[in-house]
Amino acid sequence: MRINEHSIQSLPKEERPRERLIRHGADSLSLIEILAIILGSGSKVASVLEVSRALVTRFGGLEALMQATLTELLEVQGIGFAKAIQLKAALNLGFRATRQQIKSRYLIEHSSHAYQLVKDELENENREIFMAIFQDTKGYLITYEVISIGSLSQTLVHPREVFYSAIRHKAASLIVVHNHPSGDPMPSNQDLKLTQILLEGSRLLGIPLRDHLIIGKNSYVSFKDQNLLLK
């Protein structure tokens, strides 16, 4: 059987990521080696480890790689559509596992707790994403989800969508969050108006709006901390 010179099988056995994982465990492998196992083989012009190294060089690390779009992945030499799909699926599976662990009895008592929950998903996004965090009567996280994607001035966030989800999840209270792709978290007039509309809806339905966070680059603004949740 002919072995593809750019597959993992072409490497000396002791250097193959798969065998190293078996002998030493997954924690002993570098990100490049983990990616090589996921990809399985390289291209006609590059080994699988070279393709994996190109991915890490292009995106700089796991966080940026997880946020990469299919189009961005396809720009890396050696990554075709099938491999891009493999990567997106594998990385999303890891993200879901991490998110599930976080959701297990996560208490939100301060704006920083809400920020830590969603910052990795929002602070590097080039689209404006509006999310809602739902809490139980004791302030523990029930779940959080995306309500809309796009500029708040272009994609209207209607209170009906926010509170429909709150009721569906049997939330006792909620926190809303969105990012500013510019990196500047200071609230705009549109942000202030939207918050007032949501506050009115929360009072009518008896589901308190605890906070509105705006996520910027390595920073955030909390409406509650800044006394912007006007009564």
Swiss-Prot record:
Q: Which residues bind Zn(2+)?
A: H178, H180, D191
Query: From the record, which residues define motif JAMM motif?
Result: 178-191
Superkingdom of this protein's organism: Bacteria
One Pfam entry for this protein is RadC
What family does the entry list? Belongs to the UPF0758 family.
What protein am I looking at?
UPF0758 protein pc1765
Which molecular-function annotations from GO does this UniProt entry contain? metal ion binding; metallopeptidase activity
Domain MPN positions: 107-229
Q: Tell whether Transferase is among the UniProt keywords.
A: no
Q: Any one Gene Ontology biological process term?
A: proteolysis
Q: Which UniProt keywords apply?
A: Hydrolase, Metal-binding, Metalloprotease, Protease, Zinc
| NCBIfam families noted in UniProt | PRK00024.1, radc
